[in-house]
């Protein structure tokens, strides 16, 4: 899980979602998991 100021999709499988007022990226590749913080 990477914590970044700006999250973006890295590949075509990445999905931008909002969870508990946090913007997150979930993906089939675990290296692409990100959260805004």
Swiss-Prot record:
Instruction: Indicate whether Plastid appears among the record's keywords.
Output: yes
Q: Report the InterPro entries cross-referenced here.
A: Ribosomal_bL36 (IPR000473), Ribosomal_bL36_sp (IPR035977)
Q: Which organism is it from?
A: Oltmannsiellopsis viridis (Marine flagellate)
Give the family per the record: Belongs to the bacterial ribosomal protein bL36 family.
Gene Ontology MF: a single term: structural constituent of ribosome
Name of this protein: Large ribosomal subunit protein bL36c
Instruction: Spell out the subcellular localization from the entry.
Output: Plastid, Chloroplast
- Looking at the keywords, is Lipoprotein present? no
What is one cellular component GO term in this UniProt entry? Answer: ribonucleoprotein complex
Q: Which NCBIfam families does the annotation name? A: rpmJ_bact
The record ties this protein, via PROSITE patterns, to: RIBOSOMAL_L36
Top-rank taxon, per record = Eukaryota
GO BP field: translation
Upper classification of the organism: Eukaryota, Viridiplantae, Chlorophyta, Ulvophyceae, Oltmannsiellopsidales
Q: Which UniProt keywords apply?
A: Chloroplast, Plastid, Ribonucleoprotein, Ribosomal protein
């Amino acid at each position: 899980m990477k914590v970044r100021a700006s999250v973006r999709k890295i590949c075509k499988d990445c999905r931008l979602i909002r969870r508990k007022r946090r913007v997150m990226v979930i993906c089939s590749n675990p290296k692409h998991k990100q959260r805004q913080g």
